[in-house]
UniProtKB/Swiss-Prot annotation:
Species the sequence originates in: Rickettsia canadensis (strain McKiel)
Gene3D superfamilies, sorted: YqgF/RNase H-like domain
NCBIfam families: RNAse_H_YqgF
UniProt-listed InterPro entries: RNaseH-like_sf, YqgF, YqgF/RNaseH-like_dom, YqgF/RNaseH-like_dom_sf
Family statement drawn from the similarity comment of this UniProt entry: Belongs to the YqgF nuclease family.
Molecular-function GO terms, alphabetical: nuclease activity
PANTHER family, A to Z: POLYNUCLEOTIDYL TRANSFERASE, RIBONUCLEASE H-LIKE SUPERFAMILY PROTEIN
Name of the protein in its database record: Putative pre-16S rRNA nuclease
CDD domains per the UniProt record, alphabetical: YqgF
Keyword set, alphabetical order: Cytoplasm, Hydrolase, Nuclease, Ribosome biogenesis
Length: 154
């Protein structure tokens, strides 16, 4: 189920369980995961987009393997706040995922996270090819970190 309010999303989470975040792209998805205490977010992996079914199955496999209790999906909104074609694609992905899991799904504004992730990796001297292979998972961890920081208030 897609939850629009962060406090409601938090209320639906099972204590001491992990969350995942997804940075959805047309070619690959970055996946990040929290620890059980939800104090840190870590890049987990990158999934290559083959087709919609394969992507959904990969995400569901991660959910089952790590006993995930909630999903955060980065929502790409234009810098001016305008909904874009990619915004609609991500919303459709979230709706599709919601058909296969009862977990709460929260859409988090992800403006500039992939660029920030790429700059972060670059600052550590990571080569361009390696940055491009890992920036989506790092971006997902930044998206998740934003949510983790926000839910600490509740």
């Amino acid at each position: 189920m897609i939850i629009k309010n962060l406090q409601e999303f938090y209320r639906l989470l099972i204590p001491n369980t992990q969350l995942i975040a997804i940075d959805y792209g047309s070619k690959k998805l970055g996946i990040a995961m929290s620890n059980g205490e939800r104090s840190i977010a870590m890049p987990l992996n990158t999934i290559t987009v083959v087709n919609k079914t394969a992507v959904i199955n990969s995400v569901l496999s991660i959910i089952a393997k790590y006993k995930i209790c909630g999903v955060v999906i980065g929502l790409p909104i234009d810098m001016s706040g305008v909904v874009t074609q990619q915004t609609n694609i991500v919303m459709k992905f979230a709706e599709e995922l919601a058909k296969y899991t009862n977990l709460p799904i929260y859409l988090q504004d992800e403006r500039l996270t992939t660029k920030a992730a790429n700059n972060f990796l670059k600052s550590f001297g990571v080569k361009r090819k390696d940055r491009n292979n890992n920036d989506d998972a790092v971006a997902a961890s930044m998206i998740l970190e934003t949510v983790l920081d926000s839910i600490k208030r509740y």
